[in-house]
């Protein structure tokens, strides 16, 4: 993860943005999710898709989606449900996939859009391949919306969310991300600073909150596909298609970084596909709801963690590899069994195929997992239909997406 030299006053003010205090009570969140889903169904009426995926059913069957893009912000669920992105801001159209100047970005480029102070809903004029020279450091209250076009960010450094809030990233391809840094990068119209070498993540979330990563296709990055660290919280990672990668997702900076104890992340309706090895996710300290995902490939393990994270696995489908000694879904790391047996890891309603098994630990009482519950999971038998369209969608104006 890159770091930047900031004035002390900017650093202090940013701590308020990245507070890692936990979200409201899980019961309140679940009630709000149900209210939001029901309201969305009423608003769509006969347009509702009926896939069982509450995010997709909220917006995808509206043929007028291109003229009502910001309605997407009503459809988030889970711990990141309050991520508004650039809602109520201007629509900003990216017209130039090149000219990536990290310090003085050119109007019309993606970098120029994401550093602005005002809320912006960012869309793209046409299909684009964007190869960045340095990390794309996002300012708060931004949506990157790739619907209706084919947008790739890759073959260079990729996306960083650093001391920011209210970010939505939707509908783009992120792949072949590389390390960069040791140079100046602008992160607002009024500030640029020196950034050290980045890790080469697809999306790096650092000390940020109210983040929603939805319907993206991610693969083959230098480090993680999506990493969230340093007190980041209130995050939903949903409907993404991930392939061809080793260390897929890290949630929590290190075993010694206790500020991640209040991290809350929802991982829902994703497809973990071919060529994946481990960390789907790898968790530390916080509270993680892994719900209604499709795990069709892993080489080492699917869900792991250390430093006593609370992991609630609900309604997922796990298809184990054919190799005899890699069928365990879980991996308790950096601790003897005498210690990890007390970590709260629970499997509820998961479908285990080809010999897959989940090694539970800790308490069985519902209260042990209350802070890791973020929505009402659906039966695992519905996972195939709920995740069938995971990844960046092919959407055409005037038609259902």
From Swiss-Prot:
Pfam (any one): Pectate_lyase_4
pH sensitivity of activity: Optimum pH is 10.
GO molecular function: metal ion binding; pectate lyase activity
Organism: Zinnia elegans (Garden zinnia)
Cofactors, names only: Ca(2+)
Name the record gives this protein: Pectate lyase
Enzyme Commission number(s) from the entry: 4.2.2.2
Function according to Swiss-Prot or TrEMBL: Involved in the degradation of pectin. May assist in the removal and modification of an existing pectin matrix in order to allow the deposition of newly synthesized walls polymers for a specialized function or to create an architecture that is extensible.
Cofactor remark from the record: Binds 1 Ca(2+) ion. Required for its activity.
Annotated residues for binding of Ca(2+): 199, 223, 227
């Amino acid at each position: 993860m890159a770091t930047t030299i900031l004035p002390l006053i900017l650093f202090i003010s940013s701590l308020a943005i990245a507070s890692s205090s936990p979200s409201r009570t899980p019961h309140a969140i679940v009630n709000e999710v149900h209210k939001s889903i029901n309201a969305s169904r009423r608003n769509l009426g006969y347009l509702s898709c009926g896939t069982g995926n509450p995010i997709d059913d909220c917006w995808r069957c509206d043929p007028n989606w291109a003229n009502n893009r910001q309605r997407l912000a009503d459809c988030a669920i889970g711990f990141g449900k309050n991520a508004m992105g650039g809602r109520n801001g201007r629509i900003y159209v990216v017209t130039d996939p090149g000219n990536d100047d990290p310090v003085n970005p050119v109007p019309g480029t993606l970098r120029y859009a994401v550093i602005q102070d005002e809320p912006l809903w960012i869309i793209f004029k046409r299909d684009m391949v964007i190869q960045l020279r340095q990390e794309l450091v996002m300012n708060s209250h931004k949506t990157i919306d790739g619907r209706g076009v084919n947008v790739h960010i890759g073959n260079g450094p990729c996306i960083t969310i650093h001391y920011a809030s209210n970010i939505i990233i939707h509908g783009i391809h992120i792949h072949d991300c590389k390390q960069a840094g040791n140079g100046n990068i602008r992160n607002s119209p009024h500030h640029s600073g020196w950034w050290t070498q980045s890790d080469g993540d697809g999306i790096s979330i650092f000390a940020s909150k109210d983040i929603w990563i939805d319907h993206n296709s991610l693969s083959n990055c230098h480090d993680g596909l999506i990493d969230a660290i340093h007190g980041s919280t209130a995050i939903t990672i949903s409907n993404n298609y991930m392939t061809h990668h080793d260390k897929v997702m890290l949630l929590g900076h290190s075993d010694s970084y206790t500020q991640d104890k209040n991290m809350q992340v929802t991982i829902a309706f994703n497809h973990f596909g071919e060529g994946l090895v481990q960390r789907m996710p790898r968790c530390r300290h916080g509270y993680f709801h892994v719900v209604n995902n499709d795990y069709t490939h892993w080489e080492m393990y699917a869900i792991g963690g250390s430093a006593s994270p609370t992991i609630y696995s609900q309604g997922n489908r796990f298809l184990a590899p054919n190799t005899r000694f890699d069928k365990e879904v879980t991996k308790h790391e950096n601790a003897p069994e005498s210690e990890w047996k007390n970590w709260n890891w629970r499997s509820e309603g998961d479908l285990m195929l080809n010999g897959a098994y989940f090694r539970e630990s800790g308490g069985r009482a519902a209260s042990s997992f209350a802070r890791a519950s973020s929505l009402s999971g659906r039966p695992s038998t519905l996972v195939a239909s709920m995740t069938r369209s995971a990844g960046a969608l092919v959407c055409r104006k005037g038609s259902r997406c």
